[in-house]
């Protein structure tokens, strides 16, 4: 259970970071 929780936590963190970087790049392109 612990490994599954940590796996989903890591996946969620990676997705959040990727989304943040993608949005940041889009904002830079718009400016």
From Swiss-Prot:
Instruction: Spell out the molecular function terms from Gene Ontology.
Output: electron transporter, transferring electrons within cytochrome b6/f complex of photosystem II activity
Compartments (UniProt record): Plastid, Chloroplast thylakoid membrane
Picking any one GO biological process from the record gives: photosynthesis
Any one Pfam family here would be PetL
Question: What membrane topology was assigned to this protein in its record?
Answer: Single-pass membrane protein
Alphabetical GO CC annotations of the entry are:
chloroplast thylakoid membrane; cytochrome b6f complex
Span-the-membrane segments of this chain are 4-26
- State the UniProt keywords alphabetically: Chloroplast, Electron transport, Membrane, Photosynthesis, Plastid, Thylakoid, Transmembrane, Transmembrane helix, Transport
Which cysteines are cross-linked by disulfides? none
For whether the record's keyword set contains Plastid, the answer is: yes
The family classification in the record reads: Belongs to the PetL family.
Report the function annotation for this chain. Component of the cytochrome b6-f complex, which mediates electron transfer between photosystem II (PSII) and photosystem I (PSI), cyclic electron flow around PSI, and state transitions. PetL is important for photoautotrophic growth as well as for electron transfer efficiency and stability of the cytochrome b6-f complex.
Q: How does it assemble?
A: The 4 large subunits of the cytochrome b6-f complex are cytochrome b6, subunit IV (17 kDa polypeptide, PetD), cytochrome f and the Rieske protein, while the 4 small subunits are PetG, PetL, PetM and PetN. The complex functions as a dimer.
What HAMAP family does this protein map onto?
A: Cytb6_f_PetL
Indicate what this protein is called per its UniProt record. Cytochrome b6-f complex subunit 6
């Amino acid at each position: 259970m612990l490994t599954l929780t940590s796996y989903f936590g890591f996946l969620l963190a990676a997705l959040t970071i990727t989304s943040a970087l993608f949005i940041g790049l889009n904002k830079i392109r718009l400016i």
